[in-house]
């Protein structure tokens, strides 16, 4: 996964909230198993509908961020999907979005995707449980996703219109949606547009322009607001709309649609908020990693101070530590939460998370220095680490700090294949890796800062 930075000359004083949120939306795409740029596509589609409807500048701004952040809570139900359906959560989510609205299509999808690796009796039992408890399961999964997404949006200081837009993404026009079974105009307009934009992009990506239009028509007046479907049909007559949707410069085109009346430049405090918010998205992927990013960042900050790193640079270290595992959003929970050793294929998938971290954080120039620090936390002093096999002085001091903090927290926390180790056991293991995986000075700083 490789993306070119869109702001090579950006500084903390010139980057806007729209630019940063647009870049981080790629992390949400990979969590949902969607192609890179899905949230940007949805923003392009939905923003054009908003303009066609003549929305006010404030309503267009709220819609814009609802579209980019519609999947902000998506990591919170990944582990549960994997557990319930005994399936790759990312592949399951991706496939489910292309399923028709009828009950027969849903049953066929569940039967074909659930517990595929299990024995026949086990598979029948799992499928039977899901079909018997389908309504309860669907409510649980969507409430988790919507509640988490809305909560994180509030921590990013977005207004209620945005958090409510995210919360009600899965409501349907006919009242059959979730989490609150709202009907018609009771559903926030931003939610109605976001759902339409999501369906349009998924089917356009999957099967082309005509398939997207046909699917929206099929879902009109059941899933989707018929007025919005008509608005989309009008927008879709403009060939430039489709050219823009497929443009390799879609990031810049979507950025140009961002309302400028209340454009917010990002200062250091807000960048901290964004890093903290996406740290929560990362940690929600698995209950085994709950709080991991925040603990690693806190410990890295203390060690950085004790090792004489200047406060301004230490702030970047803290952000890098918060986001070091953002690439794990692109790894299935069937791998992350496996209760036994990973096989060779699974190790390849797991190791890819470091490259994903580099790709996501490297999209924006203001994060360019931080990206390799975060992405290299599995490199080893002896050169046997990944993703690049760096060694010795090729590994920056900030990365070495994150590495030892990550190692400490991983060993001292519960994992799917073992329980948490005691502090003495953890330190003994880390000490045994000094000089091969772990920097000796960083180990001593860790020991003194616990």
Residue ranges and their predicted role:
Residues 3-450:
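Metal-dependent catalytic cores of enzymes that make or break cyclic nucleotides
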């Amino acid at each position: 996964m490789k993306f070119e930075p869109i702001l090579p000359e950006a500084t903390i004083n010139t980057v806007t909230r729209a630019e940063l949120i647009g870049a981080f939306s790629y992390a949400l795409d990979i969590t949902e198993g969607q192609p890179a740029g899905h949230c940007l596509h949805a923003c392009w589609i939905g923003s054009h509908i908003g303009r066609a409807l003549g929305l006010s500048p404030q309503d267009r701004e709220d819609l814009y961020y609802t579209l980019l952040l519609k999947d902000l809570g998506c990591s919170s139900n990944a582990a549960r999907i994997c557990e319930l359906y005994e399936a790759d959560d990312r592949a399951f989510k991706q496939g489910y979005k292309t399923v028709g609205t009828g009950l027969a299509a849903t049953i066929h999808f569940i039967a074909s995707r659930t517990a595929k690796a299990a024995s026949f009796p086990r598979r029948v039992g799992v499928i039977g449980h899901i079909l018997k408890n389908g309504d309860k399961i669907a409510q649980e999964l969507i409430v988790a996703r919507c509640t988490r997404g809305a909560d994180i949006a509030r921590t990013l200081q977005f207004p209620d219109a945005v958090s409510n837009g995210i919360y009600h993404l899965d409501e349907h026009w006919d009242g059959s949606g979730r989490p609150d079974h709202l009907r018609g105009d009771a559903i926030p307009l931003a939610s109605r547009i976001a759902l339409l934009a999501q369906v349009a992009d998924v089917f356009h990506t999957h099967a082309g322009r005509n398939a997207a239009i046909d699917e929206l028509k099929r879902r009109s007046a059941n899933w989707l607001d018929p007025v919005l479907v008509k608005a989309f049909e009008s927008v879709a007559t403009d060939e430039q709309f489709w050219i823009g949707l497929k443009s390799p410069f879609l990031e810049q085109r979507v950025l140009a649609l961002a309302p400028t009346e209340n454009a917010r430049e990002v200062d250091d405090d807000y960048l901290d908020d964004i890093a903290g918010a996406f740290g929560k998205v990362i940690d929600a992927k698995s209950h085994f990693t709950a709080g991991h990013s925040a603990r690693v960042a806190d410990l890295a900050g203390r060690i950085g101070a004790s090792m004489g790193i200047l406060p301004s640079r230490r702030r970047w270290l803290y952000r890098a530590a918060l986001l070091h595992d953002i690439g794990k959003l692109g790894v299935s929970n069937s791998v992350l939460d496996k209760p036994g050793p990973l096989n060779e294929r699974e190790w390849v998938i797991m190791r890819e998370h470091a490259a994903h971290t580099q790709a996501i954080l490297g999209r924006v120039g203001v994060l360019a220095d931080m990206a390799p620090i975060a992405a290299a936390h599995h490199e080893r002093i002896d050169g046997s680490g990944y993703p690049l096999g760096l060694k010795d002085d090729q590994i920056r001091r900030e990365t070495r700090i994150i590495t030892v903090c990550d190692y400490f927290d991983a060993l001292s926390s519960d994992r799917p294949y073992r329980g948490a180790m005691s502090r003495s056991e953890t330190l003994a293991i880390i000490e045994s890796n000094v000089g091969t995986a772990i920097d000796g000075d960083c180990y001593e700083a860790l020991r003194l800062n616990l």
